[in-house]
Amino acid sequence: MGSSVNRYDPRNIETMELVYGKGYMSAGGDAEVARILTGIKIRNRQLLDIGCGLGGAAISLVKDHHARHVDALDIDDDIIRRAGELIEATDMDDRITLTRFDGGALPYHSDQFDVIYLTATSCHLEDLYGFFSEIHRVLRCGGWVVGGEWFKAADNSAYRDWDS
């Protein structure tokens, strides 16, 4: 594991949560989670939430959509700590596992997850080919990658190749 990472000023985290709702750092909240999952049944499925932020989506995936278990990753130590507090306060800590992850190979076995959920994550990455290769490795055959992004990195050739 690399050194401690805190990418967000705590005041910004608190402001985002005030604007977007408890447990969220991006727009939409639980309704956005439901929209992203439209047509995909996750009941009793194993999910990976990459870039879990404050844990709101992971909680919704378990509580509202009945995922069996969610492994949730984020790079920021303070955000992971805050997510852990929220997950514990909502009694979801037996169904949501938090891990600080700072890139490279995902710390999971191949073919481990039924669904990979990500929002506002890949837009922060340089090595999209490596990122999506790792997603492919840990996703079970027939699984789903679902999510949304703030923007498309048009100047990134790996993204253009993936997007075409």
Identify what each model region corresponds to:
Residues 129-144:
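A short glycine-rich, Lys/Arg-flanked "PGG" loop and its adjoining helix->strand segment in the class I
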Residues 14-27:
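Class I SAM-dependent methyltransferase Rossmann-like catalytic core
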Residues 48, 54-105:
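Class I SAM-dependent methyltransferase SAM/SAH-binding core
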Residues 104-115:
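A short acidic, Gly/Pro-enriched loop at the edge of an enzyme's catalytic core
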Residues 1-17:
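N-terminal, positively charged/glycine-rich alpha-helical extensions of SAM-dependent methyltransferases
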Residues 115-127:
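A short SAM/SAH-binding and catalytic strip from SAM-dependent methyltransferases
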Residues 151-164:
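Short, glycine-/aromatic-enriched active-site segment of Class I SAM-dependent methyltransferases
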Residues 26-43:
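Conserved alpha-helix/loop element of class I SAM-dependent methyltransferases that forms part
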